[in-house]
């Protein structure tokens, strides 16, 4: 071993690489929090309570968290939102129940479905175009999924991700109304939204929008240590005893007091200074987004883009930097190239790399110097790019808040053809349709594409994974039932789920993602030459 983990971390801390990625503390906590963490790394000693049976200080801390967010009950979680997801699904769904699930859910949701042998009724999030951020889940799709489930076995829960990794939000108030009308529980994976609801400049949290169980990762977007998360209960549709029962199963019996202290410090900081923190954060974001008028080729997929494309709201703290249609020296310029150049030349590490865009993840702890470095880097990179002729941009004047988005809709079914939104960039794709237009106008076309892309399910996830199986070459697996996941990570959403029939179209997509350098997980053979299938 050339370096220990500590030596490597210490080396990184002393470098000038700027962290446009989680965790949210952004290495800025030295003066705000504690220095020598080992001094507070204790176990359940006298007067320090027990997270699994809180009666003292930890009970008080969780009650403070509930009050801060507006939940009825809140639980500390020290092994990530994954634990919260497993707990939420298991508490609501019993063995063999049906759950309505958004296809872009995190892999932990699929693992929960495996553990409870759940029947899954999928709903497809809206998609503008391959390679762009996935959109919201529409209420109509949820209504149809619940109705389909009722023909066989009524769904006990609906689970979806909002905001998405890229920051796109679904219409939680309208969705909650529909879910509750079908006597189901709404679970929202809000892992990327722990910072929501503390400022009018940011979208509201699902905690205050009618969801029943909400899971948040504190560490992703707020100043807290990695793995720290919260599970909120709102209303009386969920059995608290079952929630506590499954928390006792999934959460470690040795919770870290260092992590819990980090959570406490984070939440009290937000409670005391949220106005000043989020005001300063918003000013930095507004200043950053002015770069949109200066970029000729790179496009920032912001909240105006999300509204025009999906009629959905977007979290401005997620900076989506899109290079679709960009070229350099006669060759296509990809998201992978952008992220590599930002790191190698400008010492900026981004959160996620997709085929045509990268995500720079921000928080209240980001510095003006960090934003300025990113702006300078993007301006310089943009000056060296050109665009494919069919994707030339039209620039119009509009500041970050220059286009006033209307108040949150009651329902996403509301007619939107009268909404006239000026965007800074109307990015035209190869077909000539503008990303600035509402791409959901041709709903029948979109639904047909979703049906064509849908996978045929032969077994539940548990049946497939526990079945007799063997590894075969991918070309021999076409038409057979998969016993493995194929997951694009990050963000962690599966392309293929155990129990689904492997298609040639899927094989081609996997090869394409592999070619462009995306990280694919879930299969034993990391070279993706072979895959495990169910055998009779």
Where are these predicted regions, by residue range?
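Conserved N-terminal alpha-helix of the aminotransferase class I/II PLP-enzyme fold
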Residues: 38-80
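Conserved PLP-enzyme active-site core in the AAT-like
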Residues: 2-10, 31-34, 41, 53, ...
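Short, glycine-/Ser/Thr-/acidic-enriched flexible segments
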Residues: 27, 165, 220-221, 236-238, ...
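Intrinsically disordered, low-complexity terminal tails and inter-domain linkers enriched
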Residues: 387-452
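Structural signal for conserved beta-strand scaffold positions within catalytic alpha/beta enzyme cores
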Residues: 76, 122-124, 216, 352, ...
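N-terminal "arm"/small-domain region of PLP-dependent enzymes with the aminotransferase-like
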Residues: 1-56, 489-491
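Conserved C-terminal alpha-helix-loop-beta "cap" of PLP-dependent enzymes
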Residues: 290-395, 441-501, 508-522
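Terminal helix/beta-alpha structural elements that buttress the NAD(P)+-binding lobe
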Residues: 524-536
